[in-house]
Amino acid sequence: MKVTTTRFGELDIEEGKVIHMPEGMLGFVEKRFILLTPENLGPFCWLQAVDNPDLAFVVADAKNCAPGYTFALTAEECRALELSERSEAIFLLVVTMAPEPGDITVNLRGPIVLNPERLIARQIVIEGEKYTTRHPFFETSEKKQSGLQRLERQPEKSVPPAG
């Protein structure tokens, strides 16, 4: 299928690579996306709307962005994403780019949870004050040689019991 984008022009995408977000992203009506991973973007990817050439989000895998970032999915969220006990979800964070690398932030309160086997995703809103919508992407400490904070483990998910 052909997908037109304002950033990458016209792309030929396999129908089987389309990610379905039945509830869309908060504030947007689009429900079908593709994940573009250009080599020159390093840890960043583009979540491009299939039906709107102008709508794309820069995203990053949570395991590369925030140490200690954990949360549990509800049983209803696991069902909506068709996650089983053996499923491995991918947790994507929406990135706010900035001219200075030290000013790049990620939204920890609204992660996108993706079931890569079923290509179903959902944006989750984490209640409370534990996480912010503007968490620094790059390490501020000069002790880190890579400059990139790394997760020590992936966010937890709870899976409803089978039966």
Swiss-Prot record:
Biased composition (Basic and acidic residues): 136-156
Pfam families, per database record: FliW (PF02623)
Highest rank taxon of the organism: Bacteria
Subunit structure and binding partners: Interacts with translational regulator CsrA and flagellin(s).
HAMAP family: FliW (MF_01185)
Family statement: Belongs to the FliW family.
Keywords: Bacterial flagellum biogenesis, Chaperone, Cytoplasm, Translation regulation
N-terminal signal peptide: none
Annotated function: Acts as an anti-CsrA protein, binds CsrA and prevents it from repressing translation of its target genes, one of which is flagellin. Binds to flagellin and participates in the assembly of the flagellum.
Swiss-Prot/TrEMBL GO biological process terms: bacterial-type flagellum assembly; regulation of translation
Subcellular location: Cytoplasm
Positions of the UniProt region annotated as Disordered: 136-163
Protein name: Flagellar assembly factor FliW
A GO cellular component entry from the record: cytoplasm
